[in-house]
Amino acid sequence: MADDFRPHLLITEDDVEAIENKKQARSKDLGLDRMKHGTKLSTGLQEIVSAYTRVQGTDSLRDEDIRLFEVVLQEGEKFSNKTLREFLEQEGMTLAKVKDSRHAIVSSSKSKFDSLQQRVGAYRDNKRSNKKFQYIDDFQFPDGMGKQAPSIKELLEREATFPLDVEIMEQLLPKGTDPQVQARAEERLIALIEQNQGKIQAKPYKLSDGTPIVRAEIPLGKLEEISGDTIVSHVAPTGFYATSPMYTVQAGTPMTLNPNVSIDELPIVAVLDTGVDFPLELEPLVVEHWVPTGATPGDKKHGTNVASKVAFENLGEQLASGILTPRARIIDCNIRGLDPDSNKPDRPDLICNSTMIARIKEAVLRYKDITKIFNFSSSEETPIQGDEISILGYELDVLAIQYGVKFTISAGNHYLYRSQDTLEDILKDDDNRIAAPADSMLNIAVGAIVGAEHKEGLSRQYDVAPYSRIGPGFRGFRKPDIVSLAGTMTKAGVVPPDEYAMMIASGGQWAFQAGTSFTAPIVAGDLAEISQ
């Protein structure tokens, strides 16, 4: 390993930023005019009361002893501060959702909300009260438009009225809340959707942290009322996940495993894909073939390509020789079979969020004690919204925390190389931003750089591949996390054959393909080696 050079795993000094650790003093007086500032806070609380009065006839929480509202901190203050969080709790405000460093949704009982109004009034009138109110800039009623993904807002601005397939993320109520409150709120939300000509598209589901999701087809003109419901946290177009096509050629030489490698000692990677169909000579590398409960198996095409990139380093060079030296074993998690809930008869390859999440979670629960590395080479076909982390990106983060696993995720592919004439033009286009779930913050999103230059290609050697999506990620987070060498793509959509585009296909054939689907597994294999 000492001489093993992997340039895509190196972090240069230029990429490391030293950050000074500044200790924050909470006893400092901000020097605010108490009357002016207190009046602003009191007004905000009164507007929240007025807003609840306006929606009391239709809101999903109308009969519950709970108030959901937004707390905005002063510039420079952060919800990561423990003392500030404790102050909020003491004042009857329980954090429900931290939106960013300064904005959070909190919950309170109606009686504690009334008490909060009184205490803010005492602060305003300079009576004995908690001075920490100075760190709060405002109290606000959650804005319905602010809960909508940017693409939905754009459609509404154009006054579009057609039905849109959306996923509505509910606000997960704080721990200690009676679970029946959440259940009743969801029932009322579904009733509200149906009253507004909406159609439920699949059974409501929950993320691994308990966050409820309702998927429905709703006329755009009706989304404003639904978004304004206090139990609604975020509304975004339903996510669907696809893989890349490829072409195959007959294998030029037989494929044989290096007999000097002890297969049983190799590390293991779980491949979450369409299934694996290695030739008989390579089958010993597959620990198990598995299909989720009740699922139809995938066609094994894309999954075989991906698994070959996990199992073998510098695969193109090895295939030319015919003697393959493996570096990892594979758990074949065949999760990409037909999705009965996608409701996309014209695109049977697409899998919706609820189905994908259920299948991934089942795989993690089954294999988490055997491997900690899971490769996921599927993505949405459109860029992330960026205002909120994607549902699947969020779920992968939760699974990483709960079970100590790590996902290697393809950054996603675009087709801008078909319409743009230069790589520079591609990189300037907003449509090349990463696709979900590569916005996951705790896992590894992998992009592609070109390994070999071709005169027909738009990218030179070591340039960003002309199809590879780039950052930033959620709220400007740096993405992708890492890149690997890959094949390129011509303007006509042809993959020039070279060692970086070469991989194993189902049926004992070779394949030539380019895409971030095939760089993520390279990093998964690398990670398995260095983690052993």
Regions picked out by a protein language model, each given a short descriptive name:
Residues 1-59, 64, 82-176, 184-260:
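Autoinhibitory propeptides
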Residues 307-313, 387, 394, 398, ...:
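P-loop NTPase catalytic cores that bind/hydrolyze ATP
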Residues 391-404, 433-436:
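Catalytic-core regions built around general acid/base machinery
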Residues 173-187, 300-388, 394:
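Subtilisin-like peptidase catalytic core
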Residues 258-289, 294-352, 404, 439-443, ...:
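Subtilisin-like serine protease catalytic core
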Residues 267, 273-277, 281, 428-524:
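Extracellular S/T/G-rich loop segment that most often corresponds to the catalytic His/Ser-adjacent loop
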